[in-house]
């Protein structure tokens, strides 16, 4: 069966990452159900001639030291300035979802903070070449694959709650920060996002749920964003993108109260209502 356009793109990315050929790329991608990061890990793990985790550790440790600003950074951390400079050197826009892909890979404990252990262990796990160019190729491939790989997207999204904190001790995100992060993940105009936009069953047009969610929170939510609220927003976004009538939602469900309030607010506006359903006046 011929490859789809998406599969051809994934195959080309695999070849670029591993310096192998199309036949090998397609074999590993098929075995990994066309999940690029899983296929690449399987390839590197099956090839003893590739750089091993143990042999890459000294190189990664030196790379981390070279990235540090000796006057600003502590011995085992990159501060915000160094972290953003590093991200930019990999072609990662610090104002896009790509920054959260990188922060998840290195297990950043707060925004703009990269620890030595997170950097070394995170990159070791990828088996990507321990070089700036190797890391750039790898991270760009993962970023490009983000919208198509739901498990990867979910993993990066969930870690964004941790990486988006102002300090590791912070237990919740300020609303204004969370709104910016949601825009990175769900904004229709943002690169490599998963737009939180659904086809309307009534008008035949589209419903921009992210825009409505932002409006609702700005006018009705004065608290911070908890981890549970953050995680369940993704679940709600996925379901509402697939079903603009919100038929999956019930008052007896386990959604947080802020989402219950959002659904009620939407239905009072005539949004998220199945055809023929009455709306309380």
From Swiss-Prot:
GO molecular function, one term: cullin family protein binding
Keyword Hydrolase: no
Residues annotated as domain UBA-like: 7-44
Residue ranges constituting the DCUN1 domain according to the UniProt record: 55-267
Biological processes, Gene Ontology terms: protein neddylation
Signal sequence range: none
Keyword field contains Transcription: no
Protein's name in the database: Defective in cullin neddylation protein 1
Organism: Pyricularia oryzae (strain 70-15 / ATCC MYA-4617 / FGSC 8958)
Lineage: Eukaryota, Fungi, Dikarya, Ascomycota, Pezizomycotina
Gene (name only): DCN1
């Amino acid at each position: 069966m011929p490859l789809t356009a998406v599969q051809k793109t994934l195959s080309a990315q695999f070849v670029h990452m591993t310096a192998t050929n199309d036949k090998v790329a397609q074999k590993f991608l098929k075995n990994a159900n066309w999940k690029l990061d899983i296929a690449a890990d399987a390839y590197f793990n099956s090839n003893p001639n590739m750089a091993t985790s143990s042999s890459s550790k000294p190189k990664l440790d030196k790379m981390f030291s070279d990235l540090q600003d000796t006057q600003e950074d502590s011995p085992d951390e990159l501060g915000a300035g160094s972290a953003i400079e590093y991200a930019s050197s990999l072609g990662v826009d610090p104002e896009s979802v790509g920054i959260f892909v990188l922060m998840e890979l290195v297990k950043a404990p707060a925004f703009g903070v990269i620890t030595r252990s997170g950097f070394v262990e995170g990159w070791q796990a990828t088996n990507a070449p321990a070089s700036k160019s190797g890391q750039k190729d790898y991270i760009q491939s993962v970023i490009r694959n983000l919208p198509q790989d739901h498990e990867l997207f979910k993993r990066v999204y969930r870690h964004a709650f941790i990486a988006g904190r102002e300090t590791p001790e912070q237990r919740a995100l300020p609303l204004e920060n969370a709104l910016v992060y949601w825009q990175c993940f769900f904004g229709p105009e943002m690169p490599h996002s998963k737009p939180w936009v659904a086809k309307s069953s009534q008008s035949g047009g589209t419903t921009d749920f992210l825009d409505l969610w932002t409006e609702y929170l700005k006018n009705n939510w004065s608290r911070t964003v908890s981890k549970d609220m953050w995680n369940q927003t993704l679940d709600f976004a996925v379901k509402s993108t697939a079903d603009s009538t919100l038929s999956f939602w019930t008052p007896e469900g386990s959604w947080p109260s802020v989402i219950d309030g959002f659904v009620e607010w939407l239905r009072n506006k005539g949004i998220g209502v199945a055809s023929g359903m009455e709306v309380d006046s």
